[in-house]
Regions:
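C-terminal beta-sandwich interaction modules and adjacent acidic
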Residues: 1-267
């Protein structure tokens, strides 16, 4: 992915764009002001690479001294790879509990910020929305069928900047009393062009809130105006999840403009 990077305000750095104006006043202090604005690098989640499902599985066996219980496992998948803020991630999963303990399934949306400078890197993680399921008793199994995890007003993924990278993943896990939780990560992309977009696009302020955009070049008295800034990103209001059509509902031989083509494909 190339082009200009999306605006971003992070813990250890930012990608910020602004305009600065200065009024020259002879024999007096100049008047200055600055205004930040949001730049959004397009990530169209309607592209085929963002429509594929992400799937994985994990398993562990609990041990306590000489006693070994049966395995605990997770097999989970998302309905696609790309989403926009305001949409929901449809998570389908199978949880199997052959242990002697009651376990609780849950899923969370995570953001990872990676900052690069002078050959080193620093990583900061943030957890957002949480989805919790019903307890699974020993010897039982549970199934999630397109359980929805809402995406709040977060920044898009940033993959085209050499100093800041922003990634997202869905953590699907089992809380296991008296042991380390069993978890797995399903990487996703947060985009800027919604799924099946409807014009005009809508936007929302990021949930991280406003930041002060003053820096060492802005003196305390000469720079005037509102010097706070809140990034705004694409946000889908009133999103409704629509499950994909069943295989029996899809015509394997769609109508073509040339009937001979359809006939030959059935031979």
């Amino acid at each position: 992915m190339e082009g200009i990077s999306t605006s971003f305000e992070g813990k250890h750095g930012n990608i910020r764009y602004w305009l600065k104006a200065e009024m020259d006043k002879p024999w007096s202090f100049n008047h200055k002001t600055k205004k930040a604005f949001t730049v959004i690098s397009p990530i169209d989640i309607n592209k085929p690479e963002y429509q594929v499902s992400i799937e994985d599985g994990v398993e562990k066996t609990l041990c306590c001294w000489l006693c070994i219980s049966g395995p605990i496992s997770i097999n989970a998948r998302t309905d696609r790879r790309g989403y926009c803020p305001g949409e929901s991630i449809a998570i389908s999963a199978d949880f199997e509990n052959h242990s002697s303990r009651t376990i609780i399934p849950y899923a969370t949306l995570h953001q990872t910020q990676t900052f690069f400078a002078n050959g080193k890197s620093r990583v900061r993680g943030t957890k957002f929305t949480v989805l919790t399921g019903l307890p699974v008793a020993p010897g039982n199994r549970a199934t999630w069928d397109a359980q929805l995890l809402k995406i709040p007003a977060v920044s898009p993924s940033i993959m085209n900047c050499c100093v800041i990278k922003v990634d997202y993943y869905v953590k699907v896990a089992l809380h296991i009393p008296g042991s380390y939780n069993l978890s797995m990560h399903l990487p996703i992309v947060i985009g800027t062009v919604p799924y099946r977009p409807i014009d005009p696009p809508t936007y929302a302020e990021t949930l991280t809130g406003a930041v002060d955009i003053r820096d060492e070049d802005d003196d305390q008295y000469g720079t005037m105006g509102d010097l706070t800034y809140t990034p705004m990103y694409t946000y889908v209001y009133d999103y409704r999840y629509k499950p994909p059509p069943a295989y029996s509902e899809v015509d394997p031989y769609p109508q073509a403009s040339n009937p001979d083509v359809v006939a030959s494909s059935r031979l």
